[in-house]
Every structure is written in structure tokens, then in C-alpha cells.
Regions:
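C-terminal alpha-helix
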Residues: 134-138
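Short alpha-helix in the alpha/beta-hydrolase fold that links the catalytic acid
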Residues: 71, 80, 94-103
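Short beta-strand/loop motif that positions the catalytic acidic residue
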Residues: 77-79, 84-86, 90
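Active-site nucleophile elbow and catalytic-triad environment of alpha/beta-hydrolase enzymes
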Residues: 58-74, 80
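Catalytic histidine-centered segment of alpha/beta-hydrolase-like enzymes
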Residues: 118-129
Length: 140
């Protein structure tokens, strides 16, 4: 998920011609969204006050807001092809985040792979050879 976020954050920037496409596997929309989701899912806690306090701390100590760290905003600017991959049973990054990211990507140069029953980072293992066939087909 962190590699996917890094990929998507880069996708919205000017990249060299050698970068021809982006592939993300089990990525999240933003730091704010994933932290909020985890608070609810793991601890049954609302966003307020913890998220707001932690965000204020990040702003003062690190110089950025959790809402600024948004893969979603970067994907909206991506012009190169992008492949989105996610497992339906991911209990860390909600599967719905892939759909949000996919819809945000402009143009038709995008594809998605859904891995039924796959947990976080398990799509490659559950789909096996099909995973790699789809990835290499996308890159062609």
C-alpha cells in the first residue's frame, strides 16, 4: 500500500518519457482517509478528536497536513496509463478506495484488476499466473 501510494503520488507529477505507465496494488486515497478508516475499523473511534489532533501535530512538526498527502488528488492529474489492483477481502485498505481512485483517473487509459477474496497485498498470490498475465498485457 505504501508503494502504491508512492506510485500514485508520482503519477500526478511530470515524469520522464521513460516512465510509460503506473501500476498500483492495494493503494489508498489519502493519509487522512486511511487513518480515519483504521480508527473506525480497528478501534471503533470517530475521527474527532484524535485525527484532528494528530493532523495538527503533523502540520506543526512535519510541515504537512494528512489531507495534503493525497494519492487521489495526484491520480486526478495523471495522463499516463494506470493499472489499479485490489483484493475484495482487504481488511486494511478498503476495496472501495480502488473504485474511487479508478473513477478519478482521467481518460480511458486505465484498467483495474479485482482479486476476489484476496486480503491486503494478496492479489498476486491468489491470482497467480493470471495476475502477471494481466500486468504484462497492460504494459503492452
Amino acid at each position: 500500500s505504501m508503494g502504491a501510494a508512492t506510485t500514485m503520488m508520482t503519477a500526478g507529477e511530470d515524469t520522464p518519457d521513460q516512465v510509460v505507465a503506473f501500476i498500483e496494488d492495494c493503494g489508498y486515497t489519502s493519509v487522512w482517509d486511511i487513518f480515519s478508516s483504521e480508527l473506525k475499523l480497528r478501534f471503533g473511534m470517530p475521527e474527532f478528536p484524535l485525527m484532528y489532533t494528530a493532523n495538527l501535530f503533523a502540520i506543526t512538526k512535519a510541515g504537512y497536513s494528512f489531507k495534503e498527502a493525497s494519492a487521489l488528488n495526484q491520480v486526478k492529474k495523471c495522463e499516463k496509463p494506470m493499472l489499479f489492483i485490489h483484493g475484495t477481502a482487504d481488511d486494511f485498505i478498503p476495496y472501495e478506495m480502488m473504485d474511487i481512485l479508478y473513477q478519478a483517473k482521467p481518460g480511458d487509459n486505465k484498467e483495474k484488476i479485482t482479486a476476489p477474496g484476496a486480503g491486503h497485498g494478496e492479489a498476486m498470490y491468489l491470482l497467480g499466473e493470471e495476475y502477471w498475465d494481466d500486468v504484462f498485457t497492460f504494459l503492452e
